[in-house]
Design a protein with these regions (language model features):
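Ordered alpha/beta subdomains of enzyme catalytic regions
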Residues: 1-118
Length: 118
């Protein structure tokens, strides 16, 4: 573990690449809606029970790119202006979500956030 290990980079680098595209195109502050859903239910059930909202909210409220995160992305070749932007990123978003214990179904949004593209 690194001294400032964060969960921020526990994602596919595709997400970072798309953030860079939005940044390069100058649309990173444009408002957008993102939805989270799942395609298939486990165990061939007809529904699932939603749980973990507190963890999601806590993650989003504390999402920052640590010095180690930025150093790693620098080693991958991301440009300085983009890395500076990520180092200072502060999320401002609105969350709409299923409630703890709600029944949720495949291919239907269970979580939605409204924020800038990046």
């Amino acid at each position: 573990m690194y001294k400032d290990d964060s969960l921020t980079l526990h994602m596919d680098l595709y997400q970072i690449n798309m953030m860079q595209v939005y940044f390069n195109q100058g649309i990173h502050n444009k408002k957008a809606v993102f939805e989270v859903y799942f395609r298939q239910l486990p165990f061939k059930n007809g529904f699932a029970v939603f749980a973990g909202l507190e963890h999601i909210v806590n993650y989003l409220e504390n999402l920052t790119f640590s010095e180690t995160d930025i150093a790693y992305l620098k080693d991958l070749g991301y440009p300085k202006d983009f890395l500076d932007y990520l180092a200072n990123l502060k999320l401002e978003l609105t969350i709409n979500s299923a409630l703890e214990g709600d029944l949720v179904f495949a291919n239907e949004p269970i979580f939605q956030d409204r924020k800038s593209v990046v």
